[in-house]
A protein has these predicted regions:
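Substrate/ligand-engaging "lid" and interaction regions
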Residues: 1-341
Length: 341
């Protein structure tokens, strides 16, 4: 029978990932005699079984008590937040109005006309381009920059950060000034319109209880895509970038777990957190000399950024920003005021 496995997981090339998982089971079943080789051939036949790629974009943070209150006022009954002993979580979903779903149009047995509901069907290459537009330029880099600086400046809501002229100015410059000139244009969506909606409608949405602490999670796994790809796109001109390096310096400053008032705060989870903090051990607020040579193992790490930031001419610039960010209390704010005109 012809069949399509459509993944809506929010990750790049999600169709390949579900295909790999299913083939792992199929191969093991064949090896154990549970299924014959013909079954493996069937799963591998693109005329019969497909694994379309998709790109989904709709900011959906953890369910909010504020939204729960709204729902109760409206008479919505089932609003309990369920936490299980195994750490799983079941609840209502609070999300934004904006939504994008782009799907590779490979369905061997036909499909519903979901384009009538706004779904974009296209080829695999275009799905990938939409993903790159969002993740490398128009949304995710802005999210990460405002997350690390938001934590340093004591914010707990993304919408509140958008009222901060320096944070708002920083992400506008990262997006419009440094991102759009090298953006991947997918054709089916306009990058400039997309980023305008992000900045003017999505991130400013006070009814969406998204937090910089959530977005700051796993930053070491994100910066290579969110900043590293744009750095690569600039080639020899990467050394002229100003605001992406400032965002990276902000992440390094964030890793000290000391806010702009000089008070300790809890860092969000990250698989490399212990190693990153060990590399920065000994750096103290108020003593820029204590940072000498400490950032190199992070900024030169190609596994993190996709390139050695010293080799592309940004390492020393980021170190300079970082030194300014640790001059003392309020140095984060003062540095942003200085560079974000």
């Amino acid at each position: 029978y012809p069949f399509a496995f459509l993944s809506l997981d929010n990750c790049s090339h999600n169709g390949d990932k579900i295909k790999e998982a299913i083939l792992t089971f199929a191969d093991e079943w064949a090896a154990n005699g549970v299924a014959d080789k013909g079954f493996v051939d069937y799963v591998n036949d693109p005329q019969k079984v497909t694994f379309p790629w998709s790109m989904i974009d709709k900011i959906t943070p953890r369910s909010s008590a504020k939204v729960q209150g709204y729902l109760k006022e409206l008479g919505f009954g089932d609003t309990e937040l369920i936490h299980t002993e195994k750490g799983t979580y079941a609840a209502f979903v609070n999300a934004e109005n904006a939504q994008y779903l782009v799907i590779e149009d490979t369905f061997p047995n036909g499909r519903p006309a979901l384009e009538q509901a706004g779904v974009i069907f296209t080829d695999r290459n275009t799905v990938d381009k939409v993903e790159r537009m969002k993740v490398c330029t128009c949304l995710n880099p802005l999210h990460t920059a405002m997350a690390v600086y938001g934590c340093l400046l004591g914010y707990t809501l993304i919408a509140d950060e958008m009222k901060d002229p320096q944070i708002k100015g920083l992400i506008e410059k990262i997006g419009y000034q440094e991102g759009l000139p090298v953006v991947t244009n997918p054709g089916v969506l306009n990058p400039e319109d997309f980023i305008k909606e992000v900045l003017e409608q999505r991130l400013t949405n006070g009814n969406l209880p998204d937090t910089p602490q959530r977005i700051a999670s796993d930053t070491s796994q994100k910066v290579g895509i969110r900043f590293g790809e744009t750095i690569k796109a600039y080639g020899d001109k990467a050394k002229d970038l100003k605001y992406i390096p400032l965002a990276i310096a902000g992440w390094c400053r964030y890793l000290l777990a000391v806010d702009d008032e000089g008070k300790h705060f809890e860092l969000s989870p990250d698989p490399l957190l212990k190693d990153l903090q060990a590399a920065l051990e000994g750096i103290t607020l108020g003593n820029p000399d204590s940072a000498k040579g400490k950032l190199k193992s992070i900024l030169a790490n190609k596994d993190i950024f996709g390139s050695d930031l010293y080799e592309v001419g940004l390492g020393e610039k980021i170190e300079g920003y970082f030194d300014e960010l640790i001059v003392g209390p309020h140095a984060v704010r003062n540095t942003l005021v200085k560079y974000v005109k």
